[in-house]
A protein has these predicted regions:
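Catalytic cores of glycan-processing enzymes that make or break glycosidic bonds
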Residues: 1-166
């Protein structure tokens, strides 16, 4: 692939069940893998999605187009999972839980960090991009409203970007 398409940036979608062969192929390719913060806080088992376990050669996401927004996840997740996220990331009401999760991704060692605009705006499930396996239902229709990106939010994003050298 690298020979046929030089200069093309490729991300290995290494989500879900990972066999040793798939892990070896990703490592051999050198392509960065995906780390989704929402997957980190399943309180039932240890997780490679926790930021302290990230390799640098990865991309950290708050969620993907197929995930709930962070605000929806916080409302829908099991209490133990949210409690684990609160403890691990030091989430508090003053900063806001959604903002604290974004901070957790921004401060990770991942080479890249991606947050959905819905998460920066702390929007709920009505702004979810896609519900897998469901046709219609507003999938792929969300658009940011004019004026939603305020100067205050832009300054906040810029400050976090500078603070964490992103």
């Amino acid at each position: 692939i690298k020979t046929a398409l030089p200069g093309l940036d490729i991300i290995a979608e290494d989500l879900g069940f990972m066999t040793p062969e798939v892990i070896a192929l990703r490592e051999y390719s050198g392509f960065p893998g995906m780390k989704v913060l929402q997957f980190a806080f399943d309180s039932r088992e240890p997780s490679d999605y926790l930021p302290h376990r990230y390799p640098t050669n990865c991309i950290c996401y708050t969620g993907t187009h197929d995930n709930a927004t962070l605000a929806q996840w916080l409302g829908d997740a099991k209490g133990d999972d949210v409690a684990y996220a609160k403890q691990y990331l030091g989430l508090n009401d003053e900063e806001g839980y959604v903002n604290g999760i974004i901070r957790g991704g921004m401060s990770s060692v991942a080479d890249l960090f991606v947050a959905q605009m819905q998460d920066w705006l702390a929007l709920g499930g009505e702004t979810r991009m896609n519900v897998p396996g469901v046709l219609g239902h507003g999938n792929w229709c969300w658009r940011m409203l004019p004026g939603a990106l305020t100067d205050e939010l832009a300054d906040h994003i810029a400050a976090m970007t500078a603070m964490y050298s992103r």
